[in-house]
Regions:
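Short, conserved DNA-binding cores of transcription-related domains
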Residues: 1-104, 110
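Short, positively charged, Gly/Tyr-enriched micro-motifs
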Residues: 92-193
Length: 194
């Protein structure tokens, strides 16, 4: 038996794109009990390919939509392209990300001086999805950092994290939670300690 996996993306503008992923082969005559169904390695590979197809299409759409200036609706020029490695729960994906020139009408140019705009930086400020960062923080708070990295490598197709990456992301998530708690004026902070 051969299984083919195809993904079809329909963009907001109506354009359609088809991605052909790797197939899975399970010949009947050589099937053993271990070869029944989808194995962990097969699942990790397929999910990683699905993630790559979806993320690349999303990045393309983000860049296309970001080219339109929000102030005057003119199309901003592309400054250059850079490759970015984006860490997701289902794998590390290398994408080609455009940086855009600032529009001449941009009223915020004085407030935000600088060169090209990277639309991808808004969605991936740490080049990792928030879901992956939360999982690193969750596992890092429950296990040693090395064990958390080992667990992720065993069960997920994501790029195997180094234990220091788990530690650093736990620290950033904790700092973000602390910052949002202080900004909300948490009454628990006003209570006397001890």
């Amino acid at each position: 038996m051969d299984v083919r996996i195809t993904i079809e993306t329909t963009f907001d503008n109506g354009e359609k794109r088809t991605h052909q992923l790797d197939g899975i082969s399970r010949p009947y005559r050589v099937t053993c009990p271990d070869g029944i169904g989808l194995r962990l390695e097969d699942g990790k590979r397929v999910v990683e390919q699905i993630q790559r197809a979806i993320l690349c299409d999303q990045v393309e759409e983000i860049i296309r939509e970001s080219r339109v200036c929000p102030d005057c609706a003119s199309v901003r020029a592309i400054h250059d392209y850079r490759t970015r490695d984006l860490d997701t729960l289902f794998g590390r994906v290398r994408v080609k990300a455009a940086r855009l020139r600032r529009c001449s009408c941009d009223a915020r140019s004085a407030a935000m001086p600088g060169g090209p705009i990277s639309p991808l930086a808004y969605f991936f400020p740490d080049r990792a999805t928030p879901e992956l960062q939360r999982l690193h923080a969750e596992l890092g708070s429950r296990h040693s950092f090395r064990e958390a990295a080992r667990l992720m490598k065993s069960f997920l197709p994501c790029h195997p994290p180094h234990h220091t990456t788990v530690r650093d992301r736990l620290g950033r998530v904790a700092a973000g939670l602390e910052k949002s708690r202080r900004a909300s004026g948490d009454p628990a902070e006003a209570l006397p300690k001890g």
